[in-house]
C-alpha cells in the first residue's frame, strides 16, 4: 500500500513565471506575500512574478530578507509582515530557503506556536493558506514537497517538519529563472537534487512509481548538470536540470530521503555548510556503506547515470559510485576536510549523531546504521 502526494497543479516552461497572477487569482485567497531572496530581488529575477501579481491586483507585500539557510527568526519576521498586510496567499520565489520559509509562515499562521512544536512527521493539525512555489534553482524540489527545514537559532539545529499540509497548491517551474545561478550554486543545488534521486530510489519507502521518477531524475541530472555548470546559458541543460530536480522532488516526497540527508542537516546547521554541499561530501561514502542493502537498485541507478552493466549488480553499482565521485570533483565541490577541522567536527559529533537519528531519515536507509556507524561515516 502507498499514498501519492503532489501539488494540485504543476506548470513547466520558459516564461511561465509571468502567469503567476493568473494562478494566484484561481487558487489563492486574496493578496499575496511574495517571499524571495535579496539577490533575486536586486537582480530582477523575481520581477516577472511581481509584475504578474501587480497586473492581477494581488501584490500585497514582498519579504526578501531570506538567506540560503533560513532560521526561525526569518520565519517570525515574514509571518509578521504577512499578518500586517492582511495577505491571504503566499508566493515563494527562490531556492529552497524562500520556499521553506513560505511553508513555515503558512504553518504558523494557521496553527500558532513555533516551528519546533511541529518538528517531525505528521504533527501539523491544520492546513494553512495556499502557497504558490516558483523555484529559481535546480534544486531542492521543495516546490512539490511536504517538507520544510528551518534552523532554530538558539540551538543551532535544523528542524525538519513533514506534513502533506505543506505541499504547495501550485508549482511554477520556469527555466529562465535559473539562468542567473552562479556555477557554485548550480553545483550545490544540482547535487542536492541528485541526492534526492538516489536516496528516494533506495529508500525503504520507495514504490515502483517513485523509483521510475528517481531513475529518470538521476539520469537527467548526471548528464546535464555538468553542462549547466560549465555553460550557464545552455537552454537545454537548464531545462533538463530543472525537470530532473522536479522529478526527484516528486520521488522523495512520496518515498522519503535517507541517511545522507539525515547526516547532512546537522552538518549544515552546526558549521554553516550549504545543504547541497553537505550532501555532496557524504554521498559517495554513504552509497558504499548502503550498497549491501539494495544492490539491484544501486545498479539500476548506475545504469541510469550512464554506467555500462557489469557482471553482477554489485559491480555495476560500484561503477555508479565512480560516476558520482567524478561528478562531484568536476563540479569543484570541496571535501569535508577542506571545510572544517577534525577537532571542530569531533566537538560536535555526539550532538550531530543524535540529531541525525532523531530526524527519522536514517530509518529509511536500505542498510541500517548504528549511532557508532553514523559517527564513523
Spans of model-derived segments:
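Active-site segments that bind and position negatively charged phosphate/pyrophosphate groups
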Residues: 200-326
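Short glycine/serine/threonine-rich phosphate/pyrophosphate-binding segments
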Residues: 17-20, 42-45, 72-74, 97-103, ...
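Conserved beta-strand elements of the Class I
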Residues: 33-34, 89-91, 132
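N-terminal small/polar loop signature for handling phosphorylated ligands or for N-terminal nucleophile
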Residues: 41-116, 226-238
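Mobile late-domain/C-terminal helix-loop "cap" segments
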Residues: 284-377
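A glycine/threonine-rich phosphate-anchoring loop and its flanking beta-alpha core
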Residues: 110-206, 297-300, 304
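Glycine-rich phosphate/diphosphate-binding loops that line cofactor/substrate pockets in enzymes
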Residues: 18-33, 51-56, 84, 330
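N-terminal amphipathic/basic leader segments beginning at the initiator methionine
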Residues: 1-27
Amino acid at each position: 500500500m502507498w499514498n501519492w502526494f503532489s501539488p494540485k497543479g504543476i506548470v513547466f516552461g520558459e516564461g511561465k513565471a509571468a502567469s503567476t497572477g493568473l494562478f494566484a487569482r484561481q487558487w489563492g485567497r486574496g493578496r499575496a506575500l511574495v517571499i524571495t531572496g535579496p539577490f533575486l530581488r536586486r537582480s530582477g529575477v523575481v520581477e516577472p512574478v511581481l509584475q504578474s501579481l501587480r497586473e492581477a491586483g494581488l501584490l500585497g507585500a514582498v519579504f526578501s530578507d531570506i538567506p540560503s539557510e533560513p532560521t526561525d527568526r526569518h520565519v517570525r519576521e515574514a509571518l509578521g509582515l504577512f499578518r500586517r498586510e492582511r495577505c491571504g496567499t503566499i508566493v515563494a520565489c527562490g531556492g529552497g530557503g524562500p520556499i521553506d520559509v513560505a511553508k513555515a509562515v503558512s504553518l504558523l499562521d494557521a496553527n500558532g506556536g513555533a516551528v519546533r512544536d511541529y518538528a517531525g512527521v505528521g504533527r501539523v493539525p491544520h492546513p494553512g493558506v495556499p502557497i504558490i512555489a516558483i523555484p529559481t534553482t535546480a534544486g531542492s524540489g521543495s516546490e512539490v514537497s511536504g517538507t520544510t527545514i528551518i534552523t532554530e537559532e538558539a540551538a543551532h539545529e535544523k528542524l525538519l517538519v513533514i506534513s502533506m499540509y505543506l505541499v504547495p497548491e501550485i508549482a511554477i517551474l520556469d527555466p529562465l529563472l535559473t539562468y542567473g545561478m552562479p556555477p557554485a550554486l548550480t553545483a550545490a543545488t544540482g547535487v542536492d537534487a541528485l541526492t534526492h534521486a538516489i536516496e528516494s530510489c533506495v529508500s525503504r519507502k520507495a514504490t515502483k512509481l517513485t523509483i521510475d521518477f528517481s531513475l529518470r531524475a538521476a539520469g537527467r541530472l548526471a548528464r546535464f548538470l555538468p553542462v549547466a555548470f560549465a555553460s550557464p546559458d545552455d537552454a537545454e541543460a537548464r531545462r533538463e536540470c530543472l525537470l530532473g530536480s522536479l522529478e526527484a522532488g516528486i520521488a522523495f516526497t512520496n518515498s522519503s530521503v535517507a541517511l545522507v540527508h539525515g547526516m547532512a542537516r546537522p552538518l549544515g546547521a552546526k558549521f554553516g555548510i550549504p545543504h547541497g554541499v553537505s550532501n555532496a561530501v557524504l554521498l559517495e561514502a554513504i552509497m558504499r556503506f548502503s550498497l549491501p542493502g539494495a544492490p539491484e537498485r544501486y545498479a539500476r541507478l548506475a545504469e541510469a547515470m550512464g554506467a555500462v552493466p557489469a557482471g553482477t549488480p554489485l559491480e555495476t553499482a560500484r561503477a555508479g559510485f565512480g560516476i558520482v565521485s567524478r561528478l562531484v570533483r568536476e563540479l569543484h565541490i570541496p571535501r569535508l576536510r577542506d571545510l572544517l577541522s577534525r577537532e571542530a567536527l569531533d566537538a560536535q559529533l555526539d550532538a550531530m549523531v543524535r540529531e541525525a537519528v532523531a530526524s527519522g531519515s536514517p530509518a529509511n536507509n536500505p542498510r541500517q546504521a548504528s549511532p557508532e556507524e553514523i559517527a564513523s561515516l
